[in-house]
Amino acid sequence: MAGSSGNTNETVQATETSFELLDRIRDTNGSTLSELADYLDLAKSTTHRHLLTLENLEYVVREGNEYYLALRFLKLGESAQSR
């Protein structure tokens, strides 16, 4: 798995996995399910569940076979910037 850091004994693995997916989608400007599953060395079914959750929460959008970051991140960025 790519880029884990910190004390993993005190973290939630599913949250780390979702953020690794988001980082990879950002870095590649869109990725397919297969590409993401291969990159994180996860089963496609596991990767799909993460992506479906992120899609339902409007953090990613799917266009055809590709997943992209959604505009919801702009709201988070605006909030962080105005702090």
Language-model segment annotations:
Residues A2-Q81:
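N-terminal helix-turn-helix
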